[in-house]
Amino acid sequence: MDPRDVIIKPWITEQSTDQMEENKYTFVVAKDANKTQIKDAVQKLFGVKVKQVNTMNMKGKPKRLGIYQGKTPSWKKAIITLTDDSKAIDLFE
């Protein structure tokens, strides 16, 4: 897979911003991507050294608008831990 197909977008929340101090960055990734593909994609796109990749599948939430019901799509989140000697990812600064 192309690295741009693996990493969809950064996930910026209050909790993920706090984790950046510990060299941990959060991304929304492709649902069919595995940890090895995610690690390679981050290293190629941002030029950093990855120590660890944690992934989790996020279930879509039910939504309702008047009489219409539906749900948000399910997605996959990855928390990337960088090595201590690696530089920070510029995208988050």
From Swiss-Prot:
Its protein name is Large ribosomal subunit protein uL23
UniProt keywords (A-Z) are:
Ribonucleoprotein, Ribosomal protein, RNA-binding, rRNA-binding
The UniProt gene name for this protein comes to: rplW
**Source organism of the structure:** Natranaerobius thermophilus (strain ATCC BAA-1301 / DSM 18059 / JW/NM-WN-LF)
GO MF entries: rRNA binding; structural constituent of ribosome
Subunit annotation: Part of the 50S ribosomal subunit. Contacts protein L29, and trigger factor when it is bound to the ribosome.
Q: Does the keyword Acyltransferase apply?
A: no
Q: Does the keyword Coiled coil apply?
A: no
Tell me a GO biological process for this protein: translation
| Record-stated family | Belongs to the universal ribosomal protein uL23 family.
User: What SUPFAM superfamilies does the record point to?
Assistant: Ribosomal proteins S24e, L23 and L15e
As for what it does, the entry says: One of the early assembly proteins it binds 23S rRNA. One of the proteins that surrounds the polypeptide exit tunnel on the outside of the ribosome. Forms the main docking site for trigger factor binding to the ribosome.
Gene3D superfamilies noted in UniProt: 3.30.70.330
Give the domain of life: Bacteria
Cellular component per GO, a single term: ribosome
Family matches, as InterPro entries = Nucleotide-bd_a/b_plait_sf, Ribosomal_uL23-like, Ribosomal_uL23/eL15/eS24_sf, Ribosomal_uL23_CS
